């Protein structure tokens, strides 16, 4: 599978604040760092800066199969819902919508205001999947990582990507937990 990563300056701040991960400013450095961390094969990961307007995901002639905006601020969500594109992320989302590609948005805020909900409804009516980062607890998570895996598993399911992050509902492990 091929991954194109688009990130914002805010993503750099959040990564440092919430995960103690320092993302370099230059996309090439981020690509090298993440490629090594996740053992990406050559050509499997490509990173684009926020204003690389000539990047493949910015064009309808080379759209990705699917796109995930995770996490998605309400500002970005509103821009995407309105068809505004002041960043590469917003432009790529606009391309995904206009080309009929799968777009999954994972909103970051809580609680939602009426305006947030209206923007999400507008996107959902366009076929965009709104997937709040709300983990389930029926699998009896033992760590924050388990909660993150739950949400990541739901995202991968939306993309049709096979994974073994957690047992599925009805699997033997799931039945054992529910019968206790």
Q: Language-model segments: what does each one mean?
A:
Residues 1-104, 111-180:
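A cross-family phosphate/adenosyl-ligand binding-site feature
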């Amino acid at each position: 599978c091929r991954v194109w990563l688009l990130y914002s300056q805010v993503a750099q701040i959040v990564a440092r604040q919430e995960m103690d991960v320092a993302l370099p400013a230059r996309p090439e450095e981020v690509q090298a760092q993440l490629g090594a961390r996740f053992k990406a094969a050559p050509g499997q990961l490509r990173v684009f800066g926020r204003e690389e307007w000539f990047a493949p995901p910015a064009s309808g002639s080379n759209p990705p199969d699917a796109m995930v905006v995770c996490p998605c601020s309400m500002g970005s969500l509103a821009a995407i819902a309105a068809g505004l594109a002041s960043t590469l992320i917003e432009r790529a989302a606009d391309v995904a919508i206009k080309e009929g590609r799968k777009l999954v948005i994972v909103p970051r805020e809580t609680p939602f205001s009426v305006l947030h909900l209206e923007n999400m409804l507008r996107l959902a009516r366009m076929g965009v999947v709104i997937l709040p980062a709300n983990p389930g607890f029926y699998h009896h998570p033992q760590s924050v990582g388990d909660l993150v895996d739950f949400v990541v598993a739901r995202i991968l399911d939306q993309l049709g990507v096979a994974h073994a992050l957690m047992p599925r509902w009805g699997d033997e492990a799931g039945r054992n937990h529910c019968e206790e």
